[in-house]
Amino acid sequence: MKILDLSAGNRAIWFDRFYRDTLYVDRRAEVNPTIVADSRALPIETGDAYDLIVFDPPHANLGANGKMSSRYGHHTASEIRSIVEGTAKEAHRVSRHDALMSFKWNNHDQSFKNILELMAPWWEPLFGQKTSERSRRLRSTQWILLRRRS
């Protein structure tokens, strides 16, 4: 199985941070990805047949000088939407016709529903954690598995 991690960072979500069949992408060279690139413009040929896409995008519009910003970078709300939408489109371009995407989101500043709508032309929810109305109002992290649209 070929895996493409489009927001590798420090690989905190990985149990094996150097999984052999994974291409780790990040735009920051200091985190030592396999490829230094913007996930919205990958230097990968179309249809390179990735089976699984891992996408844990930036989700919080934090101050430029905070601890979290120094670790994950500073992004405005519109930049975050651009990253999510552009990466979803690019992931579709380089993935197999039956690929899946493991997607992580925290509704710190933008609702999960609104973010999924940005991805809808290319990816559709298959299953994931359902949330209550109360948890939608709180800052909660969710994982979902998406299926590539044809």
What does each model-found stretch correspond to?
Residues 1-16:
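Conserved class I S-adenosyl-L-methionine
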Residues 17-18, 107-150:
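Class I S-adenosyl-L-methionine
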